[in-house]
Amino acid sequence: MARTTPIARYRNIGISAHIDAGKTTTTERILFYTGVNHKIGEVHDGAATMDWMEQEQERGITITSAATTAFWSGMAKQFDAHRINIIDTPGHVDFTIEVERSMRVLDGAVMVYCAVGGVQPQSETVWRQANKYRVPRIAFVNKMDRMGANFLRVVEQLKTRLAANPVPLQLAIGAEDAFTGVVDLVKMKAINWNDEDQGTTFTYEDIPADMQDLAEEWRSNLIEAAAEASEELMEKYLGGEELTEEEIKAGLRHRVLTNEIILVTCGSAFKNKGVQAMLDAVIEYLPAPTDVESIKGILPDGKDTSAERHSDDNEPFSALAFKIATDPFVGNLTFFRVYSGVVNSGDTVLNPVKDRKERFGRIVQMHANKREEIKEVRAGDIAAAIGLKDVTTGDTLCDINAPIILERMEFPEPVISVAIEPKTKADQEKMGIALGRLAQEDPSFRVSTDEESGQTIIAGMGELHLDVLVDRMRREFKVEANVGKPQVAYRETIRSTVEQEGKFVRQSGGRGQFGHVWLRIEPMEPGGVGYEFANEIVGGVVPKEYIPAVDKGIQEQMKNGVLAGYPIVDVKVALFDGSYHEVDSSEMAFKIAGSMGFKEGFMKAKPALLEPIMKVEVETPEDYMGDVIGDLNRRRGMIDGMEDMTTGKIVRAQVPLSEMFGYATDLRSQTQGRASYSMEFLKYNEAPSNVAQAIIEARKAK
């Protein structure tokens, strides 16, 4: 089967935004104008096509990034058909992992901002992730029809809050109820969309007389931005010559692709204005798979030799699985992005991360939650496979004869855990299956068993994250469960260096046990590898076959903690001396000696308890400012700063996670429901001694 759309006409884009910027409505309109959806789905009624989990429709927030394919030939049918693959990304901070993994497989992004609320705290998190993966992006300022909408104020905030270099491509004509259309600064024409056919058709008109000067001013800003793309354009511009429309667009495209500028468009998705022109901007300014760098990876040859793949059908097949979803009808759906080559349904490929072969049973292309079966996928495509057995998010799938491991995604460690048990014995097994499925879908969600109590523990990125998962278990797997009180993931560490002997001797008749080691235990830089073992034995005083056993004994003790039973981090241990017995020494004896030595040494090396600190941002009306700050101080918060917003203030603080439980309810009652907050993990800090003491005693009492 030949390629139907040339790869240069592909656009793999994400639509990313703060919770209420109107992202889902914007995506809905895209699907409507590209002719996929004939009835526009409204989030207000909980019927949007992209939000396909029941919960998302109920809560009105987008949780999973659904992938959808659409075609667009331009507002005036001025292009050949372009294939746009859209990954919808969530805007809630507990789901940052979803944003991170979608950024990884995108070539470009559309950032949606609310014309009233502007750049909100959550937008910064998404922005940082887009920077991390160097994703070229354009902005769409939505909700121009709302009270208090102000396009140029949002442009200014992109500069001040995100340190971006925004260049408006359009200006809004009017605002609030008087918002009628946009000025296209490249063509210097006003665009008016037809209300009768929901904005499918439009007319170019003259720019309103009262906007002519403003339009001239912003057009010269746009042309200057385009001219900076190359020396030739700059010379022409400085020489006073007019740049042609083609030259302006080529210059702007070059600067968007190199991440030098962010083009800003505007409109009101709800009122069917502006999304159409934003789609044209996606085609004209965002990259095709061939415009971005080739994908880097390593060969699974044990030497980590670096390798790369280009967006080309003739290169060996390589793809990245970026999301696993459980589907009610077919089981696991593995969403993947093809970076190179071609794969057909029925082909067998390699998962080099797990060194397993996988067969592509059926390949489907998703349109929100409707699916269409296809026979093959090619470089640049995004699709889902049914029936892959052992693939986790971030795994590579590739040609068996040309193995490569593509750059993996890094997932944060969970910071909050709760005990969970099924309401009835009959649900025990069902709960196990459900949790297993959910953990496979979401790498930032972990399931484990507490060895002492036998309870099942689930851990994740925040209270909302775990709520949503427990809720999904109830709906999708019909498992009712009781959830315990949230527990914080504390860690233990040391602050000074000690040398400690560890000796395990049992010699009373029969085969004895003898293990003897000397360890040097020292603190390491926080946030690094977490643990390092150094073998400094000289002259075989401890035979080399016993050395891994010492390391293993130390690691087991680290997992179980010493102070209060929490995992130990940021410690380097060197084995520098010891002795052995010809007959009685064994791996077991050295493992116990290592563990004993480490445990004793740890308690002498100024042990400390670490607690997770969260970055908290609260948006509040000014009247409640004092209460909010007072409350954060009571929660041992450290205020980082404040910022003015149109609707009040943003307070930024660092607060220990243990103090943040139930914060949503408290904040609601303090501010009569008018404030909102977001919170994400920042770092581990040493807990104050009174707090640490209370935690240690509570653990011992158990």
From Swiss-Prot:
Alphabetical list of CDD domains matching this protein: EF-G (cd01886), EFG_III (cd16262), EFG_mtEFG1_IV (cd01434), EFG_mtEFG_C (cd03713), EFG_mtEFG_II (cd04088)
Species name: Photorhabdus laumondii subsp. laumondii (strain DSM 15139 / CIP 105565 / TT01)
Family as reported in the entry's similarity comment: Belongs to the TRAFAC class translation factor GTPase superfamily. Classic translation factor GTPase family. EF-G/EF-2 subfamily.
TM spans (from-to): none
The keyword Cytoplasm is assigned to this record: yes
InterPro entries on file: EFG_II, EFG_III, EFG_III/V, EFG_IV, EFG_V, EFG_V-like, EFTu-like_2, G_TR_CS
Function recorded in the entry: Catalyzes the GTP-dependent ribosomal translocation step during translation elongation. During this step, the ribosome changes from the pre-translocational (PRE) to the post-translocational (POST) state as the newly formed A-site-bound peptidyl-tRNA and P-site-bound deacylated tRNA move to the P and E sites, respectively. Catalyzes the coordinated movement of the two tRNA molecules, the mRNA and conformational changes in the ribosome.
Cellular localization per UniProt: Cytoplasm
UniProt keywords, alphabetically: Cytoplasm, Elongation factor, GTP-binding, Nucleotide-binding, Protein biosynthesis
One record GO biological process: ribosome disassembly
Gene: fusA
Principal location class: cytoplasm
Listed SMART domains: EFG_C, EFG_IV
HAMAP family: EF_G_EF_2_B
Disulfide cysteine pairs (residue numbers): none
GO CC aspect terms: cytoplasm
Start and end residues of each tr-type G domain: 8-290
Protein name per Swiss-Prot or TrEMBL: Elongation factor G
GO molecular function list: GTP binding; GTPase activity; guanosine tetraphosphate binding; translation elongation factor activity
Domain of life, per lineage: Bacteria
Matches recorded under SUPFAM superfamilies: EF-G C-terminal domain-like (SSF54980), P-loop containing nucleoside triphosphate hydrolases (SSF52540), Ribosomal protein S5 domain 2-like (SSF54211), Translation proteins (SSF50447)
Residues involved in GTP binding: 17-24, 88-92, 142-145
